[in-house]
Regions:
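Hydrophobic N-terminal alpha-helices or hydrophobic patches in metabolic proteins across all domains
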Residues: 1-135
Length: 135
């Protein structure tokens, strides 16, 4: 929930079975040309990761595009996304918690390899937590 009149610059959700270092599911922002609905699953491919510190903790955001949408067929890295869109996303995450008086600091974009590494680490973290439930 956002406390301000802002809206997410894409469809915002999480990557299933992927746990970020902050203990929450790994966040993802999917570039879409049409809005979807809460609870839907989108088969998406990552382009990069926006590094963010929220209330003193890392809170990375994966940027992805719908895998089967022909509009995004040629999007494979951050360099393929419009620069203005990347700037909008960075601006959004730098101000979206202003009315909560929460300190949020954008650390900038990192590329596809870093996004894949973050996703792989998050999946491993989730699997490790799952195993610990049965110990």
């Amino acid at each position: 929930m956002i406390f301000s009149s802002l809206h997410y610059p894409g469809d915002y959700g999480f990557i299933p079975q992927a746990l970020h270092a902050d203990g929450d599911p790994l966040d993802v922002l999917v570039m879409t040309n049409e809005p979807t609905f809460a609870g839907c699953v989108i088969e998406a491919r990552p382009l990069g990761v926006f590094r963010l510190v929220d209330k003193g903790q890392l809170d990375d955001k994966i940027l992805a595009v719908p895998h089967t949408d022909p509009l995004f067929h040629e999007y494979h890295t951050l360099e393929d996304a419009p620069r203005h869109f990347l700037d909008e996303v960075a601006h959004f995450f730098s101000v979206y918690k202003d009315l909560e008086s929460a300190e949020v600091v954008g650390k900038g974009w990192e590329g596809l390899e870093q996004a894949y590494a973050e996703i792989e680490n998050a999946v491993a973290r989730y699997q490790g937590d799952l195993k610990n439930l049965f110990v």
